[in-house]
Structure formats: C-alpha cells, structure tokens
Regions:
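Residues at or immediately flanking beta-strands
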Residues: 9-11, 62, 93-95, 154-156
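Terminal, non-catalytic domain-edge segments
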Residues: 322-333
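Conserved SAM/AdoMet-binding glycine-rich loop
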Residues: 17-20, 27-31, 45-124
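N-terminal juxtadomain amphipathic helix
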Residues: 68, 302-307
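Local cysteine-cluster metal-coordination motifs and their immediate loop/turn environment
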Residues: 19-27, 310-321
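Recognition helices and adjacent regulatory flanks at domain boundaries
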Residues: 1-7, 20
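Flanking scaffold residues of small Cys/His-coordinated metal-binding clusters
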Residues: 9, 13, 17, 307-311
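Radical SAM enzyme [4Fe-4S]-AdoMet core and its adjacent flexible, acidic
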Residues: 5, 13, 28-49, 58, ...
Length: 333
C-alpha cells in the first residue's frame, strides 16, 4: 500500500474525550449512554514525541487533528503538540476540527500564533445550535472564534444541516463573513438511517427527535447500497493522499474509517475487518517503523483485489459520500 517514507499527511485523534453529547456521534448511543466500547484516553506531548520523531515530523506536508470520538480542545496538550509540529516543521499545514466550546481566550490566541486552520462545528444560531451540539455554548464558541480570528487565525465555519436549522443557512453564512471566517461550509449528514433520528438520555428515554433535510434523506438509499457492496477495486483516499490515521488509544490505520475497535460487535464492517485483517496495530505495543514493516498495510491493499473489505468499499467505492455531503463557500475577507 505504502511505506513509512511515503507518508505526507496525518489525521490525528489527540483524545477520545469530549464535553458535548451530539446525538449522532459514535461516542454515545443517540446522545445518551456512552458507547460501551469507548476507551477514554488522550495523547500527551511526551507520548507524541516518543511515537513520532523529528525526522518523521519533517516529512509531513499536513497534519489534521480531529478523529472519530473526541474533541481536541478537551485534551491537555493540544496546543503543545501543535507548537512541537510548528517548531520542527515550519512549513507544515496544520488543521483542527472542534466544537469550539472550551479553553480560555489566551489559549485561542496562542493557537492562532501557531498558524493552525481551525474548523468550528457551528450548527446554526444561538436558538438552534445546541439542539444537535448538546452541552456546548454558542456564545462561548463565537467568543473563542473571535479571539482566534482577531489574532490572525484562519477560521472556517462548518454547519451540519437538519430540518430544524436549514432556514438559517443564509444568516449563518452572512454572520460567518462578518466575523472574519475564511470559509463557510454546509454538510447534509449521511448518518440518518430513515426519516427521523431519536435523541436519548442516559436512561434511554426519547428526549428529542432530529429530522433530515431532503438532501440527507436522498442519501439514505445510497448509503445502504454502499454498505452492502464489497468491491474488488476502490480508489483509496488515504493512499491517494499518502495519509495515516492515529487514534487516541494509539491504534494505527490508513484512515479514520478503518479505526473500527470502538464499533459495536454487530457491526458488519468490524466483523469483516477482523475476519480478514485480524489485527489493530497499536503504537503502545510497536513502533511506527515496526508496524509498517509488519505487512499490515499490505494485508489491507491485498484485500482490495481479492476478497474486498466492506468498510473500504463503503467509503471509497462507487458512492463518494464525503463529497456529496458538503457545499463550501470561500469568503473574500
């Protein structure tokens, strides 16, 4: 598939912790109880330096801090890791995705000094945002974003669209421009399984219901079809971008989609992966070089032309849901 010297991009999950309770996030069951397979963990600066030496950092063109389960602003050493990367690779493109509802004003100003592009998940205005981004504070997010932007930070506004907030798209776009965001994006989520999504509390009581936009609804059939396909050939996004994914527990995979350990036991993708690949390599047990030399990545690419992998077919097969979900608008400010 690729060698360690080929890697130019890293998608990095610094923590699996988060203060929010977004209903469609896999951390929780419909926003209620924690996922029983979730391991709460985070990667410190010390551990990061042990796993990724300076020579490896220097070969990277880009570094994206996000992940499947946590939010970077909850981790202790997020800023320090960005400082480490900027110090040893002045030209690296640094990005982070966050709900933006934590950390102090000085912290955000310091982050801006590291030339990190920050994508804020802001799903509407003050009256609609927290319907999905439960346990986040819209006013605090805007305050943090303004502090970041005022110190020269490159901020982007990402808005997930539902029935309850689609009437605010234009207002959010205009506000994002007024506040100094460089880009405004809308995302029609593909996480609906049918025409509604029930939000649960910690006792499995339904406390709210989310409804899809017509665009999200139109993707339900496409996603179901993609989940059933096992294609002999795919166009691997991770390979095409020379990317590596690292989870907060230290597990390594080509992309965030193959980080399947936290998935429920009945997951078709997880069971298919375990049957065919049989391992989740981890930096707590082996060095990065040892994992690359183990043949793990070759196992994955060999599967594409033999048995196929369900998750690979789903994410990089005939239906490109990543591109279908997003519409991006660049501001000239």
């Amino acid at each position: 598939m690729y060698n360690i010297t080929d890697i130019r991009s890293m998608h990095f999950e610094v923590t699996s912790k988060c203060q929010a309770k977004c209903p469609m996030c896999p951390r929780r069951i419909n926003g209620g109880k924690l996922n029983p397979n979730l391991i709460l963990d985070e990667i410190t600066l010390e551990k990061f330096g042990q796993w990724f030496d300076i020579d490896f950092v220097k070969q990277l063109d880009s570094f994206y801090m996000c992940g499947n389960l946590g939010d970077p602003i909850v981790a202790k050493d997020t800023l320090e890791i960005f400082q480490y990367l900027r110090k040893h690779n002045p030209k690296i493109y640094l990005r982070m995705h966050t709900n933006g509802s934590a950390k102090s004003i000085p912290w955000w100003k310091n982050l801006a000094e590291q030339k990190v592009t920050v994508i804020f998940g802001i799903d509407g205005l003050a009256d609609t945002h927290s319907k999905y981004r439960i346990n986040t504070d819209w006013s605090k997010i805007i305050e943090n974003a303004q502090a970041f932007i005022s110190n020269g930070g490159d901020a982007r506004w990402d808005m997930i669209i539902f029935k309850h907030n689609e009437h605010q798209i234009d207002e959010c776009r205009i506000l994002s421009n007024q506040l100094g965001f460089k880009e405004f994006s809308i995302k029609h989520t593909s996480r609906f399984k049918d025409d509604k999504f029930d939000v649960l509390d910690n006792h499995n009581n339904i406390i709210d219901t989310l409804y899809p936009t017509s665009k999200s609804k139109s993707m339900i059939t496409k996603v179901k079809k993609a989940q059933e396909e096992v294609l002999p050939m795919i166009s691997c996004k991770a390979k095409n971008q020379s990317e590596l994914y690292v989870s907060a527990t230290g597990s390594i995979s080509p992309c965030c989609w193959l980080d399947l350990e936290w998935m429920p036991e009945q997951s078709f993708s997880k069971n298919d992966y375990i049957e065919k690949i049989k391992e989740f390599p981890n930096l707590n047990n082996s060095s990065l070089k040892e994992i690359f030399n183990s043949g793990y990545f070759s196992k994955i690419s060999n599967c594409w032309v033999t048995t196929g992998l369900k998750e690979c077919s789903k994410q990089c097969g005939s239906f490109d849901k990543l591109n279908e979900q997003f519409i991006r608008i660049t501001h000239e400010n």
